[in-house]
């Protein structure tokens, strides 16, 4: 029995509403949890384990993304999406009920599985529902939703923690998630299986070994363990074994998680490389500009966080505009434009100095956001326009996967640049002054020299704490603090120049893209009608 035109439109509206709700709250989760961290540690303890709340989620969510995309192609969108939502909600409830930090970390890892499944699914479903111009428009809208969640997340998190308690940061996902499940389950097409499903178990296992080992090495290297320690070298070795094994397994699998033949497609390879390098720059700016604001300008941690707001607002604007603009100028020109705008923003960041105001710094971040909004949604659109519906899940999730890896790699690589550069600067500028101090200050000088040798970045971060600065003897602070500030500024310049290079490399890869043709208007109108009908006419079972 076929639905009326009004019934189909109603189900599609229901589905899109469910997608928006699910995507908004999964994006919101990361920012509001960060706001609640101090309260969580105050209640559960485990300060030394706090970073694992983020690391556990990162590990599981990043690893599951390509697996979710393949499962969506094999099993259908509805069962995979709804399963991800249910896992996310169940884990959220468990996080709220956690009695200690260890339990919370485990449940955050479980929550990451649900979040990682949800992450690519909205874009996959948009790719199913729409073609051409409509697809571009909705990719832009959903990119804007992600940006909006990043802007208002800290405010919502702060209100929840202050008005209720930190547990409601997790519990709030339950009523909202239930609504999203109902809307998506009712609006999204199911699939009737006609034959056996070949799960690539070996591919899943080798991917988990390779990706988790790599992310752990990048997360802990240079911070918890030295880069040449046996722990980090062992993780890199295990990552190499896992990735090589994954490539071998995937080349022979009947239903590979990430088919190796896709990398022979120039469009697939270069679009994911562009996304990888763009994410290095994006996460570099988000991570290291607050260092400048706190250490040089002297704003508080909460104030430095607001510097992200203009960047996200500008990203929201260009995400929406870009979804329409791409149909006029084309995919390749828009990506090049966005990457060049981002590069311009990074070039401006290299001009930050001791006299830079908060307004100037935020305006530079806003320029980077303009470029991000032009590029991010269009990368997914370009992949979807270049492949068949049968490959939509894999190619869409691959885009999110390589961006996540790029972000993690970028934070680690740029952090290493900052550490190395700051160590050299402090050795050149601060050590000669410490050597000139009188004998009675020898223990103080030795302490600072030890920090320069082992943790120069940590010494510079003492600028973020007024209490730490006050511990420097008054007789020496007038010399030491300016040296620390100029060293921090110069090391951040090196970080921003490195980020600029990565963005420039991404822009160069854009030149190698073949022209990607968007669906023409007449064909698009007909395809829209056919897709909408198929998407909402769900089998009864």
From Swiss-Prot:
Keywords associated with the record: Cell membrane, Membrane, Transmembrane, Transmembrane helix, Transport
Topology in the lipid bilayer: Multi-pass membrane protein
Disrupted-gene phenotype: Disruption of the gene completely abolishes the multidrug resistance observed in the mdtR mutant.
UniProt record, GO biological process: transmembrane transport
Keyword Membrane recorded: yes
Location, primary (coarse class): membrane
Cellular compartments per GO CC: plasma membrane
InterPro entries the UniProt entry points to: EmrB-like (IPR004638), MFS (IPR011701), MFS_dom (IPR020846), MFS_trans_sf (IPR036259), Sugar_transporter_CS (IPR005829)
MF GO annotations: transmembrane transporter activity
Transmembrane feature ranges: 14-34, 40-60, 79-99, 112-132, 141-161, 168-188, 201-221, 229-249, 273-293, 307-327, 329-349, 359-379, 401-420, 492-512
Protein location: Cell membrane
Pfam families the UniProt entry points to: MFS_1 (PF07690)
Expression triggers: Part of the mdtRP (yusOP) operon. Expression is repressed by the HTH-type transcriptional repressor MdtR. Induced by fusidic acid. The mdtRP expression is decreased during stationary phase, even in mdtR mutants.
Role: Multidrug efflux transporter. Contributes to resistance to several antibiotics, including fusidic acid, novobiocin, streptomycin and actinomycin, possibly by pumping these structurally unrelated antibiotics out of cells.
Stated family: Belongs to the major facilitator superfamily. EmrB family.
NCBIfam families: efflux_EmrB (TIGR00711)
Protein name: Multidrug transporter protein MdtP
Source organism: Bacillus subtilis (strain 168)
Lineage per the UniProt record: Bacteria, Bacillati, Bacillota, Bacilli, Bacillales
